[in-house]
């Protein structure tokens, strides 16, 4: 293999995910990004209005019904001279650990903020996960065609709450009905906005220079004057863009626009493709693996059931870390110590699968999984590697699950264990009774589990409330102390789907007391797969 074409393929890759609070406009921005990448001709909106198409990235039945993105889909498209892999993550209240884990498979993130609301709860949580790997973040302030808060105020909020410096690249001219466009600080030009072009790419209308009298003519003298004044303040108060600080996650370039009005998305994409990193080195337990190494390696970060209602299949999403995938190649499935030949991996344009003949470091491919692949599994061309940093997160919501037909206990357990390997839910079996407790990060996960138990395992189950506030994985280097801890806390101990010891706390106070009483025991909120 001549190395130059391979290196150029890897350096072209940009793999990113979008993070946001529910309803900040993430699915809309995904659509518009695909429109600019020419992956779709006309953008759909999520809640179908009459003949508006369903958004391309929301394809599971449940999503179509509820107008939300439940599953993480992957879309690949060309933009500028790059090949972009966009991982769409559920932004709804009802999302799962999938969202967290998807963030371990990307090299950068786009944070979408509703400029009327500022930093919201879900965004904070997702940002904590990106902090684990210092992921570079590009920010898009959305919904400028509505009345929004003072942009400076929102930038301050991002700096204070998320601990990142903000470097505006574009600046809004007016907002709501008065929204006239943005001034691009780096290019010294104003790009004018015209409403009513949400479903197509707008004709670009540019005014060069901030002091150009044409600006006063087009946006009105008083608005032009106040923008010049604002910009003087912005240039003085905000840091300039610094690529090094961006790459370490300390500074974020900020763009303003409206995803629904399809304005500003291309400016953000220009910045993302220019500055966001190509596939990076990844840490394995054994060594660091460079993206540009010849030998193939990759890890599974998510398993998705029923991507094709016609086939009851499961697809394992794999991030390629190094080397090239070619159709029919042999790989080592490290956890099982088994050689497998993969000839039917797929690439994605949400919902449209096509067979992958080649894929490179940075790409996401789908492997057909018949129950042998788990989250966190590594595949290599021979070497035994285990990539680190693919966490399990302690659930925040708990229910006891009960069968309508008690004779199906075996199928229920099998179904729950498989769904937990897939990351759809976590399951806990208390040591002192035969209960099955299901833990999730978002409410919708519970609905999904019951629906899938019925359709895939023919098991009808219902939920009951359970007195559990939180769960922690328990570890202790001293076997004697661990033994004492287990003896004294039997009533609060359970095994998870992978038979790991877990402490189930009825209240946070109970957990804190246990930590005080057993200082040598570690109570972990995350656990490596």
From Swiss-Prot:
Top-level lineage group: Bacteria
GO cellular component: cytosol
UniProt keyword terms in alphabetical order: Cytoplasm, GTP-binding, Nucleotide-binding, Protein biosynthesis
Domain tr-type G: 11-280
One record GO biological process: regulation of translational termination
Residues annotated as binding GTP: 20-27, 88-92, 142-145
Family: Belongs to the TRAFAC class translation factor GTPase superfamily. Classic translation factor GTPase family. PrfC subfamily.
Protein's recorded name: Peptide chain release factor 3
Organism of derivation: Vibrio parahaemolyticus serotype O3:K6 (strain RIMD 2210633)
Taxonomy of the source species: Bacteria, Pseudomonadati, Pseudomonadota, Gammaproteobacteria, Vibrionales
């Amino acid at each position: 293999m001549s190395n130059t074409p391979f290196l150029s393929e890897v350096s072209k890759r940009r793999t990113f995910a979008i993070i946001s609070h529910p309803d900040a406009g993430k699915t809309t921005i995904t659509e518009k990004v695909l429109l600019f990448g020419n992956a779709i001709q006309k953008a759909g909106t999520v809640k179908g209005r009459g003949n508006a198409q369903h958004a391309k990235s929301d394809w599971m039945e449940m999503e179509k019904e509820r107008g939300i993105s439940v599953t993480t889909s992957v879309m690949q498209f060309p933009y500028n001279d790059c090949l972009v892999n966009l991982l769409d993550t559920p932004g709804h209240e009802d999302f799962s650990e999938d969202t967290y884990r998807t963030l371990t498979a990307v090299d950068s993130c786009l944070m979408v903020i509703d400029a009327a609301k500022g930093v919201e709860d879900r965004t904070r949580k997702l940002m904590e996960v990106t902090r684990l790997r210092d992921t570079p973040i590009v920010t898009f302030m959305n919904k400028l065609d509505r009345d929004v808060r003072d942009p400076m105020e929102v930038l301050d909020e991002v700096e204070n709450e998320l601990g990142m410096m903000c470097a505006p690249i574009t600046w809004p001219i007016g907002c709501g009905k008065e929204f006239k466009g943005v001034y691009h600080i780096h290019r010294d030009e104003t790009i004018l906005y015209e409403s009513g072009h949400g479903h197509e790419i707008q004709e670009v209308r540019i005014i060069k220079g901030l002091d150009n009298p044409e600006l006063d003519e087009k946006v009105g003298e008083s608005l032009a004057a106040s923008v010049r004044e604002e910009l003087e303040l912005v240039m003085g108060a905000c840091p300039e863009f610094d690529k090094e600080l961006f790459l370490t996650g300390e500074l974020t370039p900020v763009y303003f626009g409206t995803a629904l009005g399809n304005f500003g998305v291309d400016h953000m994409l220009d910045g993302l493709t220019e500055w966001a990193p190509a596939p990076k080195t990844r840490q394995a337990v054994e060594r660091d693996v460079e993206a540009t190494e010849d030998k193939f390696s990759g890890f599974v970060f998510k398993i998705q059931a029923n991507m094709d209602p016609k086939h009851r299949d499961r697809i394992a999403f794999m991030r390629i870390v190094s080397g090239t995938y070619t159709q029919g190649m042999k790989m080592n499935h490290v956890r099982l110590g088994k050689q497998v030949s993969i000839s039917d991996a797929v690439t994605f344009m949400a919902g449209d699968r096509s067979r992958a003949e080649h894929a490179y470091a940075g790409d996401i491919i789908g492997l057909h999984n018949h129950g042998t692949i788990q989250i966190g599994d590594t595949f290599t061309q021979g070497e035994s590697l285990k990539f680190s940093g693919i966490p399990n997160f302690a659930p925040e919501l708990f229910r006891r699950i009960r069968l309508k037909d008690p004779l199906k206990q075996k199928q229920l357990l099998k179904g729950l264990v498989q769904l937990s390997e897939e990351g759809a839910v976590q399951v806990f079996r208390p040591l002192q009774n035969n209960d099955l407790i299901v833990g999730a990060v978002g409410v919708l996960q519970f609905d999904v589990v019951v629906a899938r138990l019925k359709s895939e395992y023919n098991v009808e189950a219902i939920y009951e409330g359970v007195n559990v506030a939180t769960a922690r994985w328990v570890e202790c280097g001293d076997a004697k102390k661990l033994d004492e801890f287990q003896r004294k806390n039997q009533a609060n101990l359970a095994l998870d789907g992978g038979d790991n010891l877990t402490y189930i706390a009825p209240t946070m106070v109970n957990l804190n007391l246990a930590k005080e009483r057993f200082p040598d025991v570690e109570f972990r909120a995350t656990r490596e797969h």
